[in-house]
Amino acid sequence: MKGFKDWVFALSNSMASSRPLLGSDPFFRDPHQEQDNHSQAPAAPQPVTLSEPPCSTSSDLEILPPLSQQQVPLESLYQSSIDLNGKKHNPLAKIGGLQVQFLRLVQRFGQSQNNILVSKVLYRVHLAMLIRAEESELKNVKLRQDRAKALAREQESSGIPELDFSLRILVLGKTGVGKSATINSIFGQPKSETDAFRPGTDRIEEVMGTVSGVKVTFIDTPGFHPLSSSSTRKNRKILLSIKRYVKKRPPDVVLYLDRLDMIDMRYSDFSLLQLITEIFGAAIWLNTILVMTHSAATTEGRNGQSVNYESYVGQRMDVVQHYIHQAVSDTKLENPVLLVENHPSCKKNLAGEYVLPNGVVWKPQFMFLCVCTKVLGDVQSLLRFRDSIGLGQPSSTRTASLPHLLSVFLRRRLSSGADETEKEIDKLLNLDLEEEDEYDQLPTIRILGKSRFEKLSKSQKKEYLDELDYRETLYLKKQLKEECRRRRDEKLVEEENLEDTEQRDQAAVPLPDMAGPDSFDSDFPAHRYRCVSAGDQWLVRPVYDPQGWDRDVGFDGINIETAAKINRNLFASATGQVSRDKQRFTIQSETNAAYTRNFREQTFSVAVDLQSSGEDLVYSFQGGTKLQTFKHNTTDVGVGLTSFGGKYYVGGKLEDTLLVGKRVKLTANAGQMRGSGQTANGGSFEACIRGRDYPVRNEQIGLTMTALSFKRELVLNYGLQTQFRPARGTNIDVNINMNNRKMGKINVKLNSSEHWEIALISALTMFKALVRRSKTEMTEENEEEKIVNFLVS
């Protein structure tokens, strides 16, 4: 059995197939109100007592006399077994009465019951009844439809009871498209004022009348203004007044009128379609019929030759439908189209009705399509298909990736103070802090000038430069030790609460200027953004946009940083960046606070992060405590909470760090993240071996292994990172990553100030890559050309 959504969009390629049941937008009727106030089922007369009382519903249907010899109320004909047990308001019985009314109108408008449009409406009504019917009623649904056809023929031929069916139609469109003229053509008499030179309708008014026994009420509205600088405000005011007017009594059908001869590929009413969608919601298009006026105008091509009428109409309708799809952000909708001509000189048939160039009499078709829309809308109200279908892009269903959140959570290490890096270096230097510096024990060296250096042999030059490099390393190590002693002494003085510990006010100094152009262009405004570092611990800088326009400011955001040591044990820092352009607005901020206790250097840390992701914001809270369990061992426990897209993700982790001597650092952690009914587990192990001259020379090699488990899948990742100096003036960085899914990458970065041959190797590699790419593109073009030639031949 098809679901409701399949029922709505199953037949979307024809004129009637676009009639899904109305949406749940407040613009449309409330189903309870519709049942109480606007139900179209005729009032049931007093039932005729039969000679023998029925025993059941099925036996009652079998012993009924011919329809021409009785007057049986519709409610009794379509009652189900549930109604016989006491329910008076059965929606299936009311739909049965609605079917009879629809079939009577089919005959009245001269349509055959075998008409494709009639068949599709009946099919949808039948399918809707099957969806809502209970198991005991399924057998009677088909029987009701057959009885409805027979009863409709009988009632329409006899005219008893009188048809009680009404239409309430809202008319929308620009000024001058023929809204009032179309209303007059439907009634066959002037009921609404028209004027060819000025707007004929300046206020909302209802025009009522009867067409073929159907009570029709048109809600005529003021025309929308053409596109201009002030039209949007005026059109919005008109639409808001219309929305207030139809709020109490919503229309059954919406007509959107436009001139067929004024539509081209440069359709200028897209902003109007967007405005209608914004005011009423996308659901208004679910029961909207596109009415094209001036449909009998002469059709000519670009060269003045006549074109096929059907293709002429189809092209223009495709344009309008395309922009409606863009306005509602949905391509499933296909609105039905009605072609209308109101000019007195239009061709007429013997009955005096307007005939279009394709031979169609548009007035009966107009009424019949409005009836189909009304019937499907009433079925939706009676069966209470609410929130079953919607137009536009679905609501954001983006969910965060638990493995990604867990990976970020495990890597994130909370700050424990402003001098966190300095503390780690001090621990390494304290081991040999009291020893005499090796630099002071070195013999003096004579620095050679350029002329003397050139006279040395190649081996002597190498020995001389190596000696200078060695002395430079020892000198830098001596400076680090002196800095470490200074910080240690300041800490001792601070702990003794001496007055000399007050920090001196730092003088404001200008920061280095941002990179400017090579030329001295006076129009370049970089001088307006010079940054100053003052003693207030706030740093404000613009964010540079590398893709900016020439002679433009080139900055599209602002960056703010601050860090403060509130007291001896409390440290706080905050970083924020805001960027905005015409397409998006991005924000990133990080806030950290750390409190340190002297007991085993225990540190409590808290971090709050905010980051934009598309149209959503990601909030992240993380807290943890770090405790030095042994002299060279530190344990860290942390918890985290992340909010994204209205969902929350909670995680926890345990991390342990061990220092082995001066050069080996081992780190292991494990954690878990939960959210949205899912769980991700992971952990990592890292071993870092530092160089002999660390931290003066940042030479080290690191081995990492991470494991993530999610939905019974395990992903292992192996990594190798190394930085070393194979020779003086040459640095090499290697980064290798691989996983158990046979995926990975290798990055090698080489930097040298002496070996210029490396630049030639890089240039040759890039040249070969460009040549290979051009050959690939030429091969693809040749293959495409061969395929085209083969198809043509």
Swiss-Prot record:
Region: G5, residue numbers: 341-343
Ranges of residues in domain AIG1-type G: 164-394
Region annotation (Homodimerization) ranges: 195-198, 259-264
GO biological process: protein targeting to chloroplast; protein transport
Origin superkingdom: Eukaryota
Matching SUPFAM superfamilies: P-loop containing nucleoside triphosphate hydrolases
Coiled-coil features, chain-numbered ranges: 130-157, 410-442, 477-503
Entry's localization field: Plastid, Chloroplast outer membrane; Cytoplasm
UniProt protein name: Translocase of chloroplast 90, chloroplastic
The gene coding this protein: TOC90
